[in-house]
């Protein structure tokens, strides 16, 4: 097992992922997160509205403009009960809340845990009919935490590229669970199914699978010729690790995780919290 200490990885600010390319604007976006803060949602809206990086903090006027520009275009799905209490003005909190869909899941059984950003950018020049799609998937929540996060950004390409198996179906399922009315985004899903994606040279297959909503969802099939495996996860279970270890035989395997002592402590805390019954009001 290789332990990652303090050497920084190359990074890309999450807001830069959301910001439209030159000559384009955000036409539609679907963001999912486990937890969120309204300031994090505000920062995302400013980026989606094209706010420059050096002004990413935004002024009240910039935020009001972003809200007006993106209303009905941007949808943020968060686990119910995991939206932090507002730390912005009440009027602005109401405006930001209009972008949020709280997904009801009993966390004693399961939670809403996907973190994705799927964005369609439309040209500012209406004579140009070509939109551009961008897809991010990773571990970051819409909060101000400074945890070490990992994500991948894929861009639409007009030549070559690959299909992302399961993406359109997964987004449809997630959006429906979040409460979006299917007819309000059917055009986007229809268009998404035909998109080809530019991926890193070493990526041979890309597929999106939803875990937790179906008992028959399993790990992907073992690709041919695997000679190295990297597993990144803060929490682990013996069964999954055992299955993944068979992918490479005696070849190189890398596990990026928390230190075992901390991981065990966190797992126990999560387990105890999951078993804890909701408190009952006391009767005087």
PLM feature spans:
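PLD/PLD-like phosphodiesterase catalytic module centered on the HKD motif
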Residues: 1-284
């Amino acid at each position: 097992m290789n332990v990652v200490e303090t050497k920084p990885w190359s990074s890309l600010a999450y807001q830069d992922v959301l910001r439209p390319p030159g000559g384009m604007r955000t036409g539609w976006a679907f963001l999912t997160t486990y937890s969120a803060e309204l300031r994090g949602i505000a920062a995302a809206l400013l980026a989606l509205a094209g706010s420059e990086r050096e002004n990413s903090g935004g002024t009240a006027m910039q935020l009001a403009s972003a809200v007006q520009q993106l209303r009905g275009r941007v949808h943020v799905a968060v686990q119910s009960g995991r939206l932090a209490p507002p730390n912005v003005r009440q009027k602005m909190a109401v405006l930001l809340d209009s972008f949020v869909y709280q997904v009801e899941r009993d966390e004693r059984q399961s939670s809403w845990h996907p973190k994705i950003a799927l964005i369609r950018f439309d040209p500012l020049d209406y004579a140009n009919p070509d939109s551009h799609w961008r897809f991010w998937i990773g571990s970051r929540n819409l909060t101000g935490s400074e945890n070490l996060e990992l994500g991948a950004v894929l861009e639409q390409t007009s030549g070559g590229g690959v299909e992302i198996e399961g993406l359109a179906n997964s987004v449809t399922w997630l959006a429906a669970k979040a409460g979006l009315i299917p007819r309000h985004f059917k055009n986007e899903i229809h268009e998404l199914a035909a998109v080809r994606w530019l991926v890193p040279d070493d990526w041979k297959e890309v597929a999106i699978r939803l875990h937790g909503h179906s008992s028959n969802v399993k790990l992907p099939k073992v690709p041919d010729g695997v000679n190295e495996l990297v597993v990144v996860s803060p929490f682990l279970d013996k069964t999954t690790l055992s299955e993944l270890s068979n992918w490479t035989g005696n070849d190189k395997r890398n596990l990026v995780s928390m230190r075992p002592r901390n991981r065990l402590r966190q797992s126990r805390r999560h387990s105890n919290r999951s078993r804890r019954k909701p408190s009952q009001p006391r009767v005087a």
